[in-house]
Amino acid sequence: MNDIQVAKESLDKIIKKARVHLYKPIQIAEILYQDRVNKNINLLDKETYRNISKKWRDVICIRFLGRVSTSSAKYQDDLFNDNAMPPKHLNILGEMNRKTNGGVESYIYKKFFERFNQMSSALEYSYSRTPDNFHLSEFLALFWLEPGLKRSIDKVYEIVVYALFSSLIEALGVKVKIDLDLSNIDLLKEFEDFTRQIISLDSENTSLELNAKINRVGVTNASDRGLDMWANFGMAIQIKHLSLTEELAENIVSSVSSDRIVIVCKESEEKLILSLLNQIGWRSKIQSIITEADLIKWYDKALRGKSAYLVGSKILEHIRNEINLEFPATDIVDFNHFFHEREYNKALDIEK
């Protein structure tokens, strides 16, 4: 391959690997836009755009996604590594972009719009279905079978787990009770301002009852480790649908400071996860391992079982609300205005 083909292939790999929000491809597009229009950077010198390009990217992301990347600075800077988009490749794309009047930028934003059209089609399932005809296996398959959406399947898993767990706990009326040990009354009186402000208890109010709740952390974790959900009754939940290594298993458990961890995984991963956890001595910290088959069974009962009237609609409501937060819809009219405002419709096609 020649240099142009290598640079283009690097770009395509980044687009293919990107989650639905396409943060890194958008950052590349905005670097190329600044180079083409304002001519205020040197593509061979990444220090002229490494940090400022995150701000350029964020302007676009806020406009069309309503959010910005929450990944670590190191992970974001990995964009310019030799195995991603090093300056020499970016410089080649810049030259091609100028010759085609923004053709590379146009190519990236077309991919962005295609990805969101794919997402819209998949998400329409959750809006058009009722408890009678919503099937979890069908919903997940929409993401597994679409290459452009497969990278976002982890967030979809989080959403369906959260929707089920939180709906059942709410419908069951689970309560959490907190009591102060009155044998430590002297300590309580000394730190009564602390207990009153932090745990809403004092010497006159020594117990508190709360509704049990599960909360999503809701922040994309680039390295796929750590906490996905937590409960106010001491449980931590880690969603794990990808292949698990011994190192990753140890990272998952050691990065969550709870001794009641619930892991959700595919059936094919269950034995491997148990084996790895036993090898590293962390099995005792795992409260339970739940498989996709368990989720499908529970969804069928919750949506169409004897008690479906108590939880069915609530589950779908949670799914829709979380999807809106995780995958905000792009305004098609605004995007088309942006596309024509930059005259990407007049740019030459880099694939011809």
Curated annotation (Swiss-Prot):
It comes from the Bacteria. It holds the Pfam family RE_HaeII. It catalyses: Endonucleolytic cleavage of DNA to give specific double-stranded fragments with terminal 5'-phosphates. InterPro entries: Restrct_endonuc_II_HaeII (IPR019058). Keywords: Endonuclease, Hydrolase, Nuclease, Restriction system. GO terms for biological process: DNA restriction-modification system. It is an enzyme of class 3 (hydrolase). Its EC number is 3.1.21.4. One of its GO terms (molecular function) is type II site-specific deoxyribonuclease activity. This is Type II restriction enzyme HaeII. The gene is haeIIR.
